Amino acid sequence: MSEYTLQQLADHVGGEVRGNSQLPILRVATLQSATGDAIAFLANSRYKSQLETTSAGAVIVSEKDDSDAIDNAIRVVNPYAAFARIAQLLDTTPKPAHGIAESAKIAPSATIGQNVSIGEYTVIDEGVIIGDNTSIGPHCYIGPETQIGAGCTLWSGVKIYHRCVIGDDCLFHSGSIIGADGFGWAPDNGKWLKIPQLGRVVIKDNVEIGASTTVDRGALDDTVISSGCIIDNQCQIAHNVFIDEDTAIAGCTVLAGSCRIGKRCMIGGASAINGHISVCDDVQIMGFAMVIKEITEPGVYASGIPASGHREWRRNGARFRQLDDLFKRVKELEKQADDNN
């Protein structure tokens, strides 16, 4: 377990220490659960009262939220971002085992970089290129001619199909599948003809893919996820989707084929984006939204129906079916009023 002084942590995040600068810190914790060897954070002023009761050794706070109720603090402009950087320093996630397991199968034509780890029963197929300092967990499969950059981590059970391209410093969680066929079929006299999916998946640097998320390969062109994107668990990214830099997508979201998502977008959980439409930069889509047409202006968008009491929902559902008739009646009343005037 790593140990840092409060001053070292403050220097790391560009903050100012108030209190004992040599206080040793071993871990991060919440305000409620922290003990004297931990540092907590306050990112929302609504919870400032918790400073009165916390047992944390120190707290990361903004200058306006600092309080005499805590003896030691690091003052920063953005407490949440500072917490994230300190949490990275004090991360206790187990590191993958070093070296290449005896049970791993590596094709003779594969190129393996320096300091690469490959877990038990993993298969590295022909023509694969793996960059330096990359770790591939047990029971993974890397398909022919796929390229994986330096400093990547693939947890157990990741599958990457043929000819995909993965950048540097990517993190793929267990069960994620990259490069499976997109859903491409042509109707033919009541039957379906499969369209070979001949494109690739190209994932740029510093991308995180959540557990059991699937990213389909392109039909002819590539499916592309740009640098800095973060995608949560159990998402479906269909063929020929393009996601621009630093976009975040929460769990169970579906991006249909050939949609384009701009930079710095945030898409809430269980949302659905229609195929062949574009979403511009800096758009926030609330959870459970259904986006069926292009979004051309930055802002916040929502379309989900909030939960309500069952009886209320049934009444509103019945009224919803009457909307078209009510609209026609209102238009007729407006016409009659205009005629009378």
Swiss-Prot record:
Pfam family, one: LpxD
Residues of the active site: 239 (proton acceptor)
CDD domains with a match to the protein in the record: LbH_LpxD
EC number, as in UniProt: 2.3.1.191
Domain of life: Bacteria
Catalytic activity as recorded in UniProt: a UDP-3-O-[(3R)-3-hydroxyacyl]-alpha-D-glucosamine + a (3R)-hydroxyacyl-[ACP] = a UDP-2-N,3-O-bis[(3R)-3-hydroxyacyl]-alpha-D-glucosamine + holo-[ACP] + H(+)
Record GO biological process: lipid A biosynthetic process
Keyword set, alphabetical order: Acyltransferase, Lipid A biosynthesis, Lipid biosynthesis, Lipid metabolism, Repeat, Transferase
InterPro entries per UniProt: Hexapep (IPR001451), LpxD (IPR007691), Trimer_LpxA-like_sf (IPR011004), UDP_GlcNAc_AcTrfase_non-rep (IPR020573)
GO molecular function: N-acyltransferase activity
Metabolic or biological pathway: Bacterial outer membrane biogenesis; LPS lipid A biosynthesis
Function comment: Catalyzes the N-acylation of UDP-3-O-acylglucosamine using 3-hydroxyacyl-ACP as the acyl donor. Is involved in the biosynthesis of lipid A, a phosphorylated glycolipid that anchors the lipopolysaccharide to the outer membrane of the cell.
Record's subunit section: Homotrimer.
Protein name: UDP-3-O-acylglucosamine N-acyltransferase
Taxonomic classification: Bacteria, Pseudomonadati, Pseudomonadota, Gammaproteobacteria, Alteromonadales
